[in-house]
A protein has these predicted regions:
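Catalytic-core region of carbohydrate-active enzymes that cleave or remodel glycosidic bonds
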Residues: 75-81, 85, 177-178, 210-256
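Aromatic-lined substrate-binding rim segments of carbohydrate-active enzymes
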Residues: 34-100, 172-177, 181-182
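An active-site-proximal structural segment forming one wall of the substrate-binding cleft
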Residues: 69-89, 111-149
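Active-site neighborhood of glycoside hydrolase catalytic domains
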Residues: 122-201
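Conserved, mostly hydrophobic/aromatic
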Residues: 14, 41, 49, 80, ...
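N-terminal carbohydrate-binding accessory modules
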Residues: 1-48, 78, 82-86
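Short, solvent-exposed turn/loop segments enriched in Gly/Ser/Thr/Pro and often Arg
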Residues: 27, 49-56, 90-100, 150-155, ...
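Aromatic- and acidic-residue-enriched carbohydrate-binding clefts of CAZyme catalytic domains
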Residues: 15, 52-64, 69, 73, ...
Length: 256
């Protein structure tokens, strides 16, 4: 059993703790390679692995859930723990992640009038029914119960999309009612409009960026209420679109 808290910094079992995490998305890698990839993550100095959870993979048809093979998230979490890594989970209904429909199931659009990522009862009903299955599986792996999970995230980059605080609060309520006890965070672009739209009272905001670190953290600091600064996604590259020119990143000095 253990504890993880957010105060002026992060505290693991009562001691200050610096999260050094890297992203490995279990659903993009065959299970036979999970251990290898996690060992490599640890070898470069990371103490934590972070992953999204794609709704459209785990519930490709309404009410039909899949958590085996590449989608065996419990096995992935356990493998990380066996290697001495902590885990950050991002079980947002929407994940972006350069993934089909941002991880939302396409069958949502079969309902007339469907409204996504807002306080709309038909949408939230589907989210809740999915969470009833998902959160029951992952709650037992929280650090408070002897597992490696130290943080979970609410939604994803919501400030780019809307600012429906009722929606965010309802997601938080559902998570806590379903047994989530580790601290929760939000994750947004480190700009005033994004942070205002995506933040939620009592939840630590974190930033996503890939350059001008000092400037980005200065903006994020305005919203953390004295809490720690965290970059949830530090982009070391960028994707190319078919038919467009390629992207070339600057040097390390420009990035940091």
């Amino acid at each position: 059993m253990g504890t993880f808290e957010i105060k002026d910094t992060f505290y693991l079992n009562g001691e200050p703790f610096q999260i050094i995490s890297g992203a490995i998305h279990y659903f993009r890698i065959v299970p036979e390679y999970w251990k290898d990839r996690l060992e490599k993550l640890k070898a470069i100095g990371c103490n934590t692995v972070e992953t999204y959870i794609p709704w459209n993979m785990h519930e490709p048809q309404k009410g039909h859930f899949h958590f085996d093979g590449m989608l065996d998230i419990e096995k992935f979490i356990q493998t990380a723990q066996d290697l001495g890594l902590y885990v950050i989970l991002r079980p947002s209904p929407y994940i972006c992640a350069e993934w089909e429909f941002g991880g939302l199931p396409a069958w949502l659009l079969a309902e007339d009038g469907m409204k996504l990522r807002v306080n709309y009862e038909p949408f939230l009903r589907h989210v809740y029914e999915y969470y009833d299955v998902l959160l029951k599986k992952i709650a037992a792996y929280q650090i408070n119960f002897g597992g490696p999970v130290i943080l979970m995230q609410i939604e994803n980059e919501y400030g780019y999309y809307a600012n429906d605080k009722d929606y965010l609060q309802l997601l938080k309520n559902k998570m806590t009612e379903s047994g989530v006890v580790v601290p929760l965070v939000t994750s947004d672009g480190p700009f005033e409009a994004n942070l205002k739209g995506g933040r939620l009272t009592g939840v630590l905001p974190t930033g996503n960026f890939g350059s001008k670190t000092e400037e980005r953290f200065d903006e994020l600091k305005k919203f953390t209420n004295g809490g720690p600064l965290m970059c949830t996604e530090f982009w070391v590259g960028w994707f190319d679109h078919w038919g467009n020119g390629g992207h070339m990143r600057g040097d390390l000095e420009q990035s940091v």
